[in-house]
Amino acid sequence: MSFFGFGQSVEVEILLNDAESRKRAEHKTEDGKKEKYFLFYDGETVSGKVSLALKNPNKRLEHQGIKIEFIGQIELYYDRGNHHEFVSLVKDLARPGEITQSQAFDFEFTHVEKPYESYTGQNVKLRYFLRATISRRLNDVVKEMDIVVHTLSTYPELNSSIKMEVGIEDCLHIEFEYNKSKYHLKDVIVGKIYFLLVRIKIKHMEIDIIKRETTGTGPNVYHENDTIAKYEIMDGAPVRGESIPIRLFLAGYELTPTMRDINKKFSVRYYLNLVLIDEEERRYFKQQEVVLWRKGDIVRKSMSHQAAIASQRFEGTTSLGEVRTPSQLSDNNCRQ
């Protein structure tokens, strides 16, 4: 709560009408801690009251008006002075005058558009909040209350498997397969690795889940890679013809839905990174983008349509070239 010099005269509180029944969700704060906030979805009404309690009943509080705002904004940490608002709604609660006793003002924002998921990342924060303001001649009295928004999707109508042969010419050829290209946040990644040719002494193989956060545009683009999980799928030397199964449960990891070009400010993408390490500690890897989405119980045709036409682009640098193309790694990486 920010009182700015007049905080001792009045206490401001924002109360939601359905606070007792509304679900709360954990959300990471900027300092890395997790706190629980009231959970909302796109299109839901936000209603409640702003309560003003005079701390000294014998004193009056003059003001230039009282208002409540619902705001959705994006803050880029390298540009903290500018807040980019994509939702901004305001309701006037009282005209200029005096507050002579404690009182409450009702408010309602009907069917509020909340197009993006709440997000706190390495270089960007997307938040929704209510802000009550008592306008004063010198310093305003301000109270904010954050909420969390989740974006829901239905099962994608198109969800093909991922299958690819990669390798180093005359040294290593493998075939990997993942059962889907799109996974919900509580899903299980099922797949297999099949060794077609092994002339490198591989001692270890793992799959990493990598989150890539991209912020900014043009020359001011920042990329932040975060390894969310490391999953060992093999310890020891494989032989030709060997097949290694993959079964990776996503529910145990801190993941968000894939976010693409959010308000032209940032993106969040996820990659499965297949890593092989040989006896000389050299690393060979292949990245494959997958789409993550939040499964919802509410069926919405518009969301289903968006999920069906969502573009599939699998990008990312790789050290294992596809078998059908010339390898960028030299043959001296092989060990007979």
From Swiss-Prot:
Keyword terms: Cytoplasm, Endosome, Membrane, Phosphoprotein, Protein transport, Transport
Residues carrying Phosphoserine: 302, 304, 319
Localization of this protein: Cytoplasm; Membrane; Early endosome; Late endosome
Keyword Glycoprotein belongs to the record: no
GO BP terms in the entry: cellular response to type II interferon; intracellular protein transport; regulation of macroautophagy; regulation of neurotransmitter receptor localization to postsynaptic specialization membrane; retrograde transport, endosome to Golgi
Presence of the UniProt keyword Transmembrane in the record: no
Coarse class of the protein's main subcellular location: cytoplasm
Annotated Gene Ontology cellular component terms: cytosol; early endosome; endosome; glutamatergic synapse; late endosome; phagocytic vesicle; postsynaptic early endosome; postsynaptic recycling endosome
InterPro entries listed in its UniProt record: Arrestin-like_C (IPR014752), Vps26-related (IPR028934)
Membrane topology: Peripheral membrane protein
Role, per record: Acts as a component of the retromer cargo-selective complex (CSC). The CSC is believed to be the core functional component of retromer or respective retromer complex variants acting to prevent missorting of selected transmembrane cargo proteins into the lysosomal degradation pathway. The recruitment of the CSC to the endosomal membrane involves RAB7A and SNX3. The SNX-BAR retromer mediates retrograde transport of cargo proteins from endosomes to the trans-Golgi network (TGN) and is involved in endosome-to-plasma membrane transport for cargo protein recycling.
Protein family per UniProt: Belongs to the VPS26 family.
Complexes and interactors: Component of the heterotrimeric retromer cargo-selective complex (CSC), also described as vacuolar protein sorting VPS subcomplex (VPS,) formed by VPS26 (VPS26A or VPS26B), VPS29 and VPS35. The CSC has a highly elongated structure with VPS26 and VPS29 binding independently at opposite distal ends of VPS35 as central platform. The CSC is believed to associate with variable sorting nexins to form functionally distinct retromer complex variants.
Descriptive protein name: Vacuolar protein sorting-associated protein 26B
Organism: Homo sapiens (Human)
Protein's gene: VPS26B
